[in-house]
């Protein structure tokens, strides 16, 4: 994870009191921190080096094009940047995030800004929260663009005071000195603010690549292959890293599939971690998976006292009072602390997502209709950034690590939602996540007891 932080100062107010808040995000990017002023815009970035660990990828990126200057920061990973670089001949090297401002320059020079926005629906594969500021030849701010990925895997908050400042930060704790209303920047949104004679703001929604209606598939053989391919593709994209990768393994089907498929793709033992209390069931099932896939497995135990002691920082870290999120965050916080302080891993693969995407909560058995189940699933995914997505991001980034969430990949979501809702509803014939499980049935990827382990 990285931390982005910026202020557009509209009326020359004294913003010195806000600058200390920039350092509240340091844990998100322990490798390099930079804060710079461009005209009336303050741009800060804390970097966790994952792709291209050299200083060449330190942000903010400053690009000069004819009579304009582009200043760009991004907390994200663009997994298909090499393909895009080759297609457009942009020469981004090994810096994945640099592809976005390079594409912006290319499209605004040759096509339109609307065509640039469409790339986020159709071409750019990854998760991101970014700020892009464009200055004219007189170094005046002419426009700026703020964007966040389709389900909000990467966090972003904003404060807008029409008379004084626009404020953007990866976490709310980067805005503690601001006494106005803090809002979460909406997932799946690109916002453009034009700053010429008068300010004009327009928002584009990126939902069409997953939330649009698609023809439903009911051929079970086709379903299994499509789901299997989508899962493998989503995981494969996230295995690209210049830093070591850890895998959280609870023994549930979600994290177990991520670990098992990754082990096959990598072709050598991976490093798995399970966290729990003595007597818990997760440890037993996680060990079963670890033995089956031959991983280097670590068990991290904590006591009730240690869990309670961590609560205060868990609440500060997750920035929520939601009791379910806090309860579920304690274990992830403690295992992330272990990985961050006792290993050299910097990327953490997690299994969040299928409960929402696949309608896997036990109450889904009682959905009144297939189509209400479909609607409910989409609503849960739209809100996942406030709950499980928040937990995965904050608990992992708290210790200078990056969480990757393959089951929130747009390809997987779109593929699973293309299954006819009548086949997705859990019942006496199809258990929850049936088609996710069925896609890997009979491959000896996981023990049958794990692959078909019912959600507890």
Segments and roles (model prediction):
Residues 1-73, 77, 114-218, 229-236, ...:
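N-terminal glutamine amidotransferase
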Residues 8-13, 135-138, 142-145, 153-156, ...:
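ATP-dependent adenylate-handling active sites, centered on carboxylate activation for C-N bond formation
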Residues 87-92, 108-111, 175-182, 321-322, ...:
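Short, polar/flexible loop-turn hinges at active-site or ligand-entry regions and domain interfaces
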Residues 18, 64, 74-138, 248, ...:
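Short histidine
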Residues 33, 85-86, 289:
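Short acidic/glycine-rich loops and adjacent helix/strand connectors
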Residues 386, 447-456:
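PAPS-dependent sulfotransferase catalytic core
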